[in-house]
A protein has these predicted regions:
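Histidine-rich, glycine-flanked metal-binding segment
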Residues: 1-29
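Metal-associated gating/positioning segment near the N- to mid-region
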Residues: 23-92, 109-118, 182, 206, ...
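Acidic, metal/ion-coordinating pockets
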Residues: 56-59, 63, 99-100, 122, ...
C-alpha cells in the first residue's frame, strides 16, 4: 500500500467493488514539501520558548503539524527544535501531520544566532537538551564534532548550523559571520560520515560563501547574497532555501504574535533584500527549495510563500521547489516529489 502501481492515460479495468475517484478536470500533484520549518516554535520569542515545558510544547505542536498537513504538506524539514520523538509520533499515527525530517538542536557558537541569552544574562547555556529551545552551543572543532555526533546519535536526518547572525537572536548582528571554517568543515565531515547533509542559516554573501565552500548542502535565507554567491551555488550544486513569507508575516503581525520589539529593527536589513536575492538566484540558475520559517501563530501563512515567489519565479519552478527539488535535497528521490510508478 501507499505506492503508485501504474500511470496511464487509459482507465484500467478494475473489479466492481474497487473505489474509483473520477478527478477529470482536476490536477494531481505530489505532496508538497517545506524545506524550512520549526514545528515546535510556538512563539517567535526564542528566549521565552526555551523556558516552555517540553510536554506543553509537544502537545501544542500537534496543531502546528495538523495545519501543515491540511495545507498539502506531506514532508517537512525541521530546522531546529523537533526531534525523533515528534517524528516517531507522526510515523506511528499518534499525531496527524507530515513526515518530519529533523535536525534536533541547531548548532550555534556562543553569542550566535542559536544563543538566546540577553547581554545581561550570565547563566551557562548549553541548549539544555530537555527544553524546547531550537539550538545548542558548540565552540571549537572538538565541541562541534561532539555536538554533531550527538544529534546524529539521536537520529538527525540533517545537521543545522548557524553560520551568521539573525533577526530573532538578541546579541548578534545580521551581517556577522559565525563559526570558523574549521568548525564548519568539522560538522560537514561528521554529517557526510553519517550519510546525511548540513543546512546552514546564513544571510550575507560572506557568510553564505564560507558555508558553501565548507561543504554545506543547503543555504537557508540568504537574503544578502551577491553574484559571487550565485556562482558558488552553481559550482558546488548547493541548494538555496529562501524564506520570504516569515519576514512579511513578522512585519505585519510579529509584535502581536510575540516577536520581541527590540529586535524588530533587524527586519529591515533583510525584508526588501529577500526579493532581490531570489531574482538573482533564479536568473543564475540556482536550484531552489520551498521554505517558510514561520513562527508561532504565523504558521498559518505557510502557503503565502508561493505568492511571494511567483512575483519572480515561474509557476513550473515554484512547483519543482516544493516537490522534486526538495526530494533531491532531502535524498528522497523516488520516494516523494513526483507522481510516478513505485
Amino acid at each position: 500500500g501507499g505506492r503508485i502501481k501504474r500511470v496511464s492515460p487509459q482507465r484500467p479495468k478494475v473489479a466492481k467493488s474497487t473505489r474509483v475517484l473520477d478527478l477529470k478536470g482536476k490536477v494531481l500533484m505530489p505532496g508538497l514539501c517545506d524545506g524550512h520549518v520549526h514545528v515546535t516554535a510556538l512563539t517567535p520569542d526564542f528566549s521565552a520558548l526555551a523556558r516552555y515545558s517540553p510536554f506543553y510544547t509537544a502537545a501544542r505542536s500537534a496543531d502546528v503539524l495538523d495545519g501543515m498537513l491540511m495545507r498539502g504538506f506531506t514532508t517537512v524539514r525541521d530546522a531546529g527544535g523537533a526531534d525523533y520523538g515528534l517524528a516517531k509520533a507522526v510515523d506511528e499515527g499518534y499525531m496527524r501531520g507530515p513526515r518530519i525530517l529533523f535536525c534536533g538542536k541547531a548548532l550555534s557558537q556562543t553569542g550566535g544566532h542559536g544563543d538566546v541569552r540577553a547581554a545581561g544574562e550570565n547563566f551557562t547555556f548549553e541548549g539544555c537538551f530537555c527544553c524546547p529551545g531550537l539550538g545548542r552551543i558548540a565552540d571549537g572543532v572538538d565541541e562541534m564534532r561532539r555536538a554533531a555526533r550527538d544529534e546524529i546519535r539521536k537520529g538527525a536526518t540533517q545537521i543545522k548550523l548557524m553560520v551568521s547572525g539573525g533577526v530573532s537572536s538578541p546579541t548578534d548582528r545580521v551581517d556577522s559571520t559565525q563559526f570558523s571554517m574549521d568548525e564548519i568543515i568539522a560538522a560537514v565531515e561528521e554529517a557526510e560520515a553519517a550519510n546525511i547533509h548540513v543546512m546552514a542559516h546564513a544571510y550575507t554573501a560572506r557568510a553564505v560563501n564560507r558555508a558553501i565552500v565548507g561543504g554545506v548542502r543547503s543555504i537557508e535565507h540568504g537574503n544578502l547574497i551577491d553574484e559571487t554567491s550565485v556562482e558558488l551555488f552553481v559550482k558546488h550544486g548547493t541548494f538555496y532555501v529562501p524564506t520570504l513569507s516569515t519576514y512579511n508575516a513578522i512585519k505585519a503581525e510579529g509584535l502581536k504574535a510575540g516577536f520581541p520589539p527590540e529586535l524588530l529593527s533587524k527586519l529591515d536589513d533583510v525584508l526588501v533584500a529577500g526579493g532581490r536575492a531570489l531574482a538573482m538566484a533564479y536568473d543564475g540558475g540556482v536550484k531552489m527549495v520551498y521554505g517558510t520559517d514561520l513562527l508561532g501563530d504565523m504558521h498559518r501563512h505557510q502557503l503565502k510563500e508561493f505568492g511571494l515567489r511567483a512575483k519572480v519565479v515561474s509557476a513550473a519552478e515554484l512547483i519543482r521547489s516544493a516537490t522534486c527539488n526538495a526530494a533531491e535535497l532531502f535524498g528522497m528521490q523516488g520516494e516523494i516529489g513526483t507522481v510516478s510508478v513505485g
